[in-house]
UniProtKB/Swiss-Prot annotation:
This is Hsp90 co-chaperone Cdc37. It comes from Drosophila melanogaster (Fruit fly). GO terms for cellular component: cytoplasm. The gene is Cdc37. Forms a complex with Hsp90. Interacts with a number of kinases such as Cdk1, sev and aurB. Co-chaperone that binds to numerous kinases and promotes their interaction with the Hsp90 complex, resulting in stabilization and promotion of their activity. Required for cytokinesis and chromosome segregation in mitosis and male meiosis. Keywords: Cell cycle, Cell division, Chaperone, Chromosome partition, Cytoplasm, Developmental protein, Meiosis, Mitosis, Phosphoprotein. Its main location: cytoplasm. The keyword Cytoplasm applies.
Amino acid sequence: MVDYSKWKNIEISDDEDDTHPNIDTPSLFRWRHQARVERMAEMDHEKDELKKKRQSYQARLMDVKERISKKDGDEEALKKELEKIEAEGKELDRIESEMIKKEKKTPWNVDTISKPGFEKTVINKKAGRKPDENLSEEEREQRMKQFVKENEKLCQQYGMLRKYDDSKRFLQEHLHLVGEETANYLVIWSINLEMEEKHELMAHVAHQCICMQYILELAKQLDVDPRACVSSFFSKIQHCHPEYRAQFDSEIEGFKGRIQKRAQEKIQEAIAQAEEEERKERLGPGGLDPADVFESLPDELKACFESRDVELLQKTIAAMPVDVAKLHMKRCVDSGLWVPNAADLEGDKKEEDDSDDVAGGEEKTDDAKSESAAKEEPIYTGVSTEDVD
């Protein structure tokens, strides 16, 4: 047979309870609930006090018994103290018994009438890492340009931060920066800073770049979105084991070394490109470099071009074998060191000038004649030692 007596004494407010017309029912329920909560808080406080006294009693009891067994001190005084402590223990037992009886007589209420039979915890699944999109090189380059155009200032602000807490807060406020694009931008910026010989600033930006790369690597290991790993990484790096920190610092040093190497390569490439452009600008009509051609000439021909002596050049060419002379002169023409048929061109110009002078009834002076004679000589371009250097 089921005993329903325990359900007779329940302190639960009911909307159908009879109350005085002048008393607001909701207010009455609130007062009752407040009084019940205060009684429960007082009961819990009494339990805590009793527990503390019980612990103190047991510690003192063990201490006195140990001292009596070791005969440490006045035996009579110790026995009296033991009797006193045991009396306190009996009093504590009585208080505990009364408290249990009082608790049993306490009516059930909405807070004590039931207990949870089981609990269920639901943990949200972390956001999965976005799969790498199959983009062509042109599309990736276009996306990178658009990202830099929209977020270059933010990337530079992140690269200049020094404290981990500041970096964590900044990335959490700008989660769209957590990605490969930011890491790539920081790499390029580090190379440019190294090329500008801003070594300390490069080292700082390199540190921030490695932080971003560690976040991305952590996301790959956990197979989650990188934005979900920002807090985890900075918490880990601030309270990490010495081995992890040493590995992190080693990665930074290796990265800085690669940046310095790449910067030197780009500088050499820029120098080589500038030299190539300069060489192309001075190429002759045949596509040969006059400096290279000049260096390949025999010493006697070099002396002719350096002294700009046409007669000496003609004598030197006449003294050389025909095949060798043709080869050298062809190279001089292709490089622009020598301009062929210059005398004919200048001669035609002279005849035109002479006809103009005759029509005007003017006679040439000795100076004009000497100038005309000079124009009959072939024209060539010389090469100075500065061009060779």
